[in-house]
Amino acid sequence: MHVTHLSLADFRSYARVEVPLDPGVTAFVGPNGQGKTNLVEAVGYLATLGSHRVSSDAPLVRMGAERAIIRAQVRQDERRQLVELELNPGKANRARINRSSQVRPRDVLGIVRTVLFAPEDLALIKGDPGERRRFLDELITARSPRMAGVRSDYERVLKQRNTLLKTAALARRHGGRSMDLSTLDVWDQHLARAGAELLAQRLDLIAALQPLADKAYEQLAPGGGPIALEYKPSAPGEAHTRDALYEQLMAALAEARKQEIERGVTLVGPQRDELLLKLGQLPAKGYASHGESWSYALALRLASYDLLRAEGNEPVLVLDDVFAELDTRRRERLAELVAPGEQVLVTAAVDDDVPGVLAGTRYTVSEGTVERV
């Protein structure tokens, strides 16, 4: 699969831009702040319905514009598709496939798939647990786009349940009459049902990712491993099947109910779980050096790419200003590993930041203009 044409309107710094794209390597080169990352950010948005740089859509819309449009022509084997997203901050986003009538934005998931390497990837190792949960859940959705709906359902139920718990906590704190919490039983069931499906997918993903990540780390840092991915659930137990995970979550919710009512928040579930990344016998966070942390983060991304490729539709590889962050050895090794990709999009401030093995199409990006060299 590869993107053959990218069109943006009022996205970030671009009033309008059209960029033809080839298979193989394409590099966007230009000084920082000129808009090169905006291009690959748009491709990534089509794949995840989110940005790797900001948490909301508002910064993605050009100043003074009401909405932004991302449009891409995609080719997979002999099949061609046109996918379009309209970003409307404060309102519902819109989507179209092949200029048809409007579809839900999440219906476009799976048409474009990406694996993104970026300076922010260090947060996978050094950041808080939310960074690692996001990594898992975005990859789960790339493997199975229907999981976007499951994640949305879980977040909706969690929000409703937290509202109920907060109201109960405030009532108790101010000496008010005790609330009828019978509806909490219903929310527990909904939360456990969606949570169990999400947990089952996370556990399956980790099992599939572990050998690939260990292999990738050895390729990047020979003799530096092994590495291990260990899931730490907030609901104690050893369950792996969806039904067993449902029962495990229900038991944990029952056990935590008194404390949850006191604190006014849900204390167990996927939103509280942790992915522990180990280097040797120690947690990478706090123990891995800067170079080891980079190798670990790159290994996770390479493993993601290998997994998606093995399961069918090869993703677009996006390397956003990542080579400037790496020492010479890691830079050369990473370039060798990604060079055979069906489509590889690279951004760099200067030509020298693009390894020679990644020779291909070049664009210069300056002051909002994108020109092929």
UniProtKB/Swiss-Prot annotation:
HAMAP family on file: RecF
GO cellular component, one term: cytoplasm
GO molecular function: ATP binding; single-stranded DNA binding
Family in the record: Belongs to the RecF family.
Source organism, top-level taxon: Bacteria
Keyword DNA-binding found: yes
Name of the protein this chain belongs to: DNA replication and repair protein RecF
Gene: recF
Record PANTHER family: DNA REPLICATION AND REPAIR PROTEIN RECF
The keyword Nucleotide-binding appears for this protein: yes
Record: residues binding ATP: G30, P31, N32, G33, Q34, G35, K36, T37
Annotated function: The RecF protein is involved in DNA metabolism; it is required for DNA replication and normal SOS inducibility. RecF binds preferentially to single-stranded, linear DNA. It also seems to bind ATP.
Pfam families assigned: SMC_N (PF02463)
The entry's keywords: ATP-binding, Cytoplasm, DNA damage, DNA repair, DNA replication, DNA-binding, Nucleotide-binding, SOS response
Cellular localization per UniProt: Cytoplasm
One GO term (biological process): SOS response
